């Protein structure tokens, strides 16, 4: 049985596209970057922790596999997680305005017996120049809350994107091609 260790509705919807039966484990993992931890190491660690905590929660019944993922926006080495309030969301969007940033999504798959696999997908996203009015209207919509980097590419935030190189679904929170490949490889081993 496959489990998705995530509170993200978007990740649930994306995983459904793979037409693989799964159940959701709703858990909360502290997402705190360690001092001097590289952004890619941070997203890998958090994704792995989500999967491992999820596996511990379901136990060994029915040979479970648990999928965990984490997504962060990175600009000039600075990690933009989920904004804590509307003011921080506006600050993040102003920083991203007219710039190219990276969106890093790590996906970890673990199973009983310590078997594990992981993939990291890095996409480059360029934003158009945003006016203060555009930022204010978007922040007022509430959409930035709960989103890494304070935007949802699958929502109104897509209007800000002038260029994307990489995985659209990865920017959303679960890179489908790489996740499908990870699951297939895991089944073969």
UniProtKB/Swiss-Prot annotation:
Pfam families: Maf. Keywords: Cytoplasm, Hydrolase, Nucleotide metabolism. SUPFAM superfamilies: ITPase-like (SSF52972). The active site is at residue 70. GO terms for biological process: nucleotide metabolic process. Its EC number is 3.6.1.9. The keyword Cytoplasm applies. The keyword Cytoplasm applies. Its cofactor is a divalent metal cation. It is an enzyme of class 3 (hydrolase). One of its GO terms (molecular function) is nucleoside triphosphate diphosphatase activity. It is found in: Cytoplasm. It comes from the Bacteria. It catalyses: a ribonucleoside 5'-triphosphate + H2O = a ribonucleoside 5'-phosphate + diphosphate + H(+); a 2'-deoxyribonucleoside 5'-triphosphate + H2O = a 2'-deoxyribonucleoside 5'-phosphate + diphosphate + H(+). GO terms for cellular component: cytoplasm. NCBIfam families: maf (TIGR00172), PRK04694.1 (NF003403). Nucleoside triphosphate pyrophosphatase. May have a dual role in cell division arrest and in preventing the incorporation of modified nucleotides into cellular nucleic acids. Belongs to the Maf family. This is Nucleoside triphosphate pyrophosphatase.
